[in-house]
From Swiss-Prot:
Belongs to the RbsD / FucU family. RbsD subfamily. It comes from Thermotoga petrophila (strain ATCC BAA-488 / DSM 13995 / JCM 10881 / RKU-1). The keyword Isomerase applies. The active site is at H20. PANTHER family: D-RIBOSE PYRANASE (PTHR37831:SF1). GO terms for molecular function: D-ribose pyranase activity; intramolecular lyase activity; monosaccharide binding. It is found in: Cytoplasm. Pfam families: RbsD_FucU. Pathway: Carbohydrate metabolism; D-ribose degradation; D-ribose 5-phosphate from beta-D-ribopyranose: step 1/2. Its EC number is 5.4.99.62. Catalyzes the interconversion of beta-pyran and beta-furan forms of D-ribose. Keywords: Carbohydrate metabolism, Cytoplasm, Isomerase. This is D-ribose pyranase.
Length: 135
């Protein structure tokens, strides 16, 4: 049995298979995941698990060079935005942050290698993690 890092075998596999610039979408409980997309639905209750706790564990294993957020998060959910940016910055201070309109975010997410649905129940609690390289 694995002791540390991502213990969910499907998420662990998704991260292990990512290459440079591949994307992984970590989304809230209401996000429209495309039919046929590879997904892990972690929701057990409203708010559980939260976006930040899921991202925190994934960052232990995934090298991230950029995150993509919906620009609507700036007005509708600045608390989560700030906590997320701080969390990602602790792991890598050079991470780029890109804001796009929510409709564009949904289009971009369709090219993700996978989706992880959290129990996040705050508006626009979604992030796309863009994989970096370790060399």
């Amino acid at each position: 049995m694995k002791r540390v890092g991502i213990l969910n075998s499907t998420i662990s596999e998704m991260v292990a298979n990512m290459g440079h610039t591949d994307m992984l979408a970590i989304v809230d409980m209401g996000f429209p995941i495309p039919d046929g997309a590879k997904k892990v639905d972690l929701v057990v209750d409203k708010g559980k698990p939260g976006l930040l706790e899921v991202v925190e564990v994934i960052l232990k294993e995934l090298e991230v060079e950029k995150i993509i957020l919906a620009e609507e998060m700036n007005e509708k959910n600045p608390e989560t935005r700030d906590l997320l940016i701080n969390l990602v910055g602790k792991n890598n201070s050079n991470v780029k942050i890109e804001f796009v309109p929510h409709e564009e975010f949904k289009k971009i997410s369709r090219t993700s290698k996978g989706f992880v649905r959290t129990g996040a129940d705050r508006p626009y609690s979604n992030v796309i993690l863009v994989s970096g390289v370790i060399f």
